[in-house]
């Protein structure tokens, strides 16, 4: 089980990430200059209506959007962890998954956020960070 505080703690380790609060949903988002890597994502009325039409419901708890490396990666994450990650029609064709923080393991959250950050970080910054952490 993870929390927004875990997201803050994990992303604080990544260079050039800032947290912003606000936007159209009023929640927090974590970004680099290249864009968001993660964001709080409450349901919109249209999400609830579309899910209801599909016979599905929005899960309880805090939901976090996390960027992934394209549609193939998205499909793999959704298939591998169906109780943790989900998607909605609004995200069709968009490289991100929705994450149930109340069920995700903190280590898996760290891996997903690291991968998302690597997609958004400058290549030289990412390479230096990977080397510093023994991952390169």
Predicted features and spans:
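Charge-dense, helix-prone N-terminal extensions
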Residues: 1-136
């Amino acid at each position: 089980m993870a929390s927004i505080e875990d997201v803050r703690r994990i992303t604080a380790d990544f260079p050039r990430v800032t947290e912003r609060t606000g936007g159209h949903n009023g929640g927090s988002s974590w970004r680099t200059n290249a864009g968001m890597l993660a964001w709080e994502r409450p349901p919109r009325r249209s999400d609830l209506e579309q899910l209801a039409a599909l016979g599905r419901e929005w899960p309880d708890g805090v939901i976090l959007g996390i960027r992934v490396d394209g549609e193939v990666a998205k499909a793999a994450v959704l298939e591998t962890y169906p109780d943790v990650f989900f998607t909605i029609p609004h995200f069709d064709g968009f490289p991100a998954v929705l994450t149930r923080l109340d069920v995700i393991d903190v280590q898996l959250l760290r891996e997903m956020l690291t991968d998302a950050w690597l997609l958004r970080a400058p290549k030289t910054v990412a390479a230096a960070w990977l080397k510093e952490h023994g991952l390169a």
